[in-house]
Protein backbone atom coordinates (compact mmCIF):
# COMPACT_ATOMS: atom_id res chain seq x y z
CA UNK A 1 0.00 0.00 0.00
CA UNK A 2 1.31 3.44 -0.91
CA UNK A 3 1.29 6.11 1.78
CA UNK A 4 2.85 9.47 0.91
CA UNK A 5 4.42 11.80 3.46
CA UNK A 6 4.34 15.48 2.51
CA UNK A 7 6.61 17.82 4.43
CA UNK A 8 6.79 21.61 4.31
CA UNK A 9 8.99 23.83 6.46
CA UNK A 10 6.36 26.56 6.91
CA UNK A 11 2.58 26.60 7.31
CA UNK A 12 2.16 28.43 3.99
CA UNK A 13 3.84 25.47 2.26
CA UNK A 14 1.33 22.89 3.50
CA UNK A 15 -1.90 24.85 4.05
CA UNK A 16 -3.26 24.41 0.52
CA UNK A 17 -2.45 20.69 0.61
CA UNK A 18 -4.34 20.23 3.88
CA UNK A 19 -7.29 22.14 2.40
CA UNK A 20 -7.43 19.67 -0.52
CA UNK A 21 -7.18 16.49 1.53
CA UNK A 22 -9.76 14.61 3.53
CA UNK A 23 -8.34 14.75 7.05
CA UNK A 24 -9.20 11.64 9.06
CA UNK A 25 -6.95 12.16 12.06
CA UNK A 26 -4.61 14.78 13.54
CA UNK A 27 -1.79 13.74 15.88
CA UNK A 28 0.83 15.70 17.76
CA UNK A 29 4.27 14.08 17.96
CA UNK A 30 6.85 16.27 19.68
CA UNK A 31 6.66 19.74 18.18
CA UNK A 32 5.02 18.58 14.95
CA UNK A 33 1.38 18.09 14.03
CA UNK A 34 0.67 15.27 11.56
CA UNK A 35 -2.51 15.31 9.48
CA UNK A 36 -3.48 11.84 8.27
CA UNK A 37 -5.99 11.34 5.50
CA UNK A 38 -6.39 11.02 1.76
CA UNK A 39 -5.97 12.98 -1.42
CA UNK A 40 -8.17 11.12 -3.86
CA UNK A 41 -7.48 7.44 -3.21
CA UNK A 42 -3.94 8.01 -1.93
CA UNK A 43 -3.20 7.88 1.78
CA UNK A 44 -1.17 10.91 2.88
CA UNK A 45 0.47 12.25 6.01
CA UNK A 46 1.09 16.01 5.94
CA UNK A 47 3.20 18.00 8.38
CA UNK A 48 4.88 21.36 8.80
CA UNK A 49 8.30 20.48 10.13
CA UNK A 50 9.88 23.87 10.74
CA UNK A 51 12.86 25.36 8.94
CA UNK A 52 16.14 23.50 8.72
CA UNK A 53 17.65 20.12 7.94
CA UNK A 54 17.37 18.80 11.48
CA UNK A 55 13.65 19.60 11.68
CA UNK A 56 13.08 18.02 8.26
CA UNK A 57 15.03 14.91 9.29
CA UNK A 58 13.04 14.53 12.52
CA UNK A 59 9.76 14.87 10.64
CA UNK A 60 10.80 12.49 7.84
CA UNK A 61 12.01 9.91 10.36
CA UNK A 62 8.72 10.13 12.28
CA UNK A 63 6.78 9.69 9.05
CA UNK A 64 8.84 6.61 8.13
CA UNK A 65 8.83 4.96 11.56
CA UNK A 66 5.44 5.89 13.03
CA UNK A 67 3.31 6.32 9.91
CA UNK A 68 5.15 3.89 7.58
CA UNK A 69 5.13 6.21 4.57
CA UNK A 70 6.45 4.69 1.36
CA UNK A 71 7.31 8.01 -0.31
CA UNK A 72 8.23 11.47 0.98
CA UNK A 73 7.70 14.75 -0.86
CA UNK A 74 9.19 18.03 0.30
CA UNK A 75 7.02 20.95 -0.69
CA UNK A 76 8.07 24.58 -0.69
CA UNK A 77 11.22 26.31 -1.86
CA UNK A 78 13.36 23.57 -0.29
CA UNK A 79 16.26 25.98 0.04
CA UNK A 80 16.48 26.68 -3.67
CA UNK A 81 19.47 28.68 -4.80
CA UNK A 82 18.14 28.99 -8.36
CA UNK A 83 16.30 32.23 -9.17
CA UNK A 84 14.67 30.60 -12.22
CA UNK A 85 12.58 28.27 -10.04
CA UNK A 86 9.12 29.70 -9.42
CA UNK A 87 6.29 28.94 -7.01
CA UNK A 88 4.43 25.90 -8.33
CA UNK A 89 7.40 24.48 -10.22
CA UNK A 90 8.21 20.82 -9.64
CA UNK A 91 11.89 20.05 -9.16
CA UNK A 92 13.26 16.51 -9.21
CA UNK A 93 16.96 16.24 -8.47
CA UNK A 94 19.22 13.72 -10.12
CA UNK A 95 22.37 14.89 -8.36
CA UNK A 96 22.84 16.91 -5.20
CA UNK A 97 25.61 18.61 -3.28
CA UNK A 98 25.57 19.27 0.43
CA UNK A 99 26.16 23.00 -0.20
CA UNK A 100 26.55 24.20 3.39
CA UNK A 101 28.93 21.48 4.59
CA UNK A 102 32.48 22.73 4.17
CA UNK A 103 35.57 20.72 5.03
CA UNK A 104 37.94 21.98 2.34
CA UNK A 105 40.68 22.71 4.93
CA UNK A 106 40.95 18.93 5.37
CA UNK A 107 41.56 18.39 1.65
CA UNK A 108 38.03 17.52 0.53
CA UNK A 109 36.13 19.31 -2.28
CA UNK A 110 33.22 21.63 -1.39
CA UNK A 111 30.12 19.63 -0.53
CA UNK A 112 31.97 16.35 -0.01
CA UNK A 113 30.95 14.20 2.94
CA UNK A 114 33.73 11.69 3.65
CA UNK A 115 32.61 8.19 2.69
CA UNK A 116 29.87 9.38 0.33
CA UNK A 117 29.89 10.14 -3.38
CA UNK A 118 30.20 13.86 -4.08
CA UNK A 119 26.99 14.33 -6.03
CA UNK A 120 25.20 11.03 -6.48
CA UNK A 121 22.54 10.10 -3.94
What do the predicted segments below correspond to?
Residues 1-2, 86:
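Phosphate/ribose-phosphate-bearing ligand recognition and processing surfaces
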Residues 2-67:
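N-terminal short beta-loop-beta anion/metal-coordinating cradle
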Residues 15-17, 57, 82-84, 101-102:
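Short glycine-/acidic-enriched loop or helix-start segments at secondary-structure transitions
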Residues 86, 91-93:
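Structural signature of FAD isoalloxazine-binding scaffolds in flavoprotein oxidoreductases
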Residues 101-117:
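Acidic/polar active-site rim loop that often engages polyanionic ligands
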Residues 119-121:
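Conserved small/polar residues in nucleotide/adenosyl-binding loops
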Amino acid sequence: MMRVGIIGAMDVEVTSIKERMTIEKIEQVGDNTYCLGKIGDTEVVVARCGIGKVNAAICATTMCVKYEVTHILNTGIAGSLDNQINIGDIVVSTDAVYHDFRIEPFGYPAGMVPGLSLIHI
